[in-house]
From Swiss-Prot:
Record's catalysed reaction(s): pseudouridine(1915) in 23S rRNA + S-adenosyl-L-methionine = N(3)-methylpseudouridine(1915) in 23S rRNA + S-adenosyl-L-homocysteine + H(+)
Transmembrane helix in keyword set: no
Entry EC number(s): 2.1.1.177
Descriptive protein name: Ribosomal RNA large subunit methyltransferase H
Record note on quaternary structure: Homodimer.
SUPFAM superfamilies: alpha/beta knot
Top-level EC class as recorded in UniProt: transferase
InterPro entries from the UniProt entry: Alpha/beta_knot_MTases (IPR029028), RlmH-like (IPR003742), tRNA_m1G_MTases_N (IPR029026)
């Protein structure tokens, strides 16, 4: 199985890097994980930022037309761990078994981006720093694999 995380910016603090790498190493037992970091554009107005960065994402995601694209969007349907696991499990059972998780820019996705035919998932209605969310996403991916394989995982 191939999993990609497309996101903006780099992890810049050692504790973020170490935490993410811990989960990435754990995930490697079950899937190939690749992180694609995009440079976020900052202009003066939030709406301009949303449009520029969302257009960059739309263009970048064209290369992954054979993947299921899942946008992590706080305003979308909340998924439980089990529901999230089902997304991964359903893709694992497909021949292509390719998923791209998209973490949007700091100003959020543009309306144009949200109108694309991508699955949208939320882990809740709280606002998190992007670097921390990347770790939480990796942890949930790892947890999903543990559940799918009936392996114990400390709760």
């Amino acid at each position: 199985m191939n999993i990609k995380i497309v996101c903006f910016g780099k992890l810049d603090k050692k504790f973020f890097i170490d935490s993410f790498n811990e989960y990435a190493n754990r995930i490697s037992k079950y899937a190939n994980l690749q992180v694609i970091e995009l440079k976020e554009e900052y202009q003066k107005e939030d709406v301009v930022n949303k449009n520029i960065n969302s257009d960059l994402l739309i263009d970048k995601l064209k290369a992954f037309s054979d993947h299921e694209i899942i946008c992590m969007d706080v305003s979308s349907k909340n998924y439980s761990t089990e529901e999230f696991m089902s997304i991964i499990e359903n893709n694992k059972n497909l021949k292509q078994a390719k998923i791209v998780f998209v973490i949007g820019p700091s100003d959020g996705f543009s309306d144009k981006f949200l109108q694309q035919n991508y699955k949208k998932v939320s882990f809740g209605n709280i606002t998190l720093p992007h670097q921390l969310f990347r770790i939480i996403l990796a942890e949930q991916i790892y947890r999903a694999f543990k559940i799918m394989n009936n392996e114990k995982y400390h709760k």
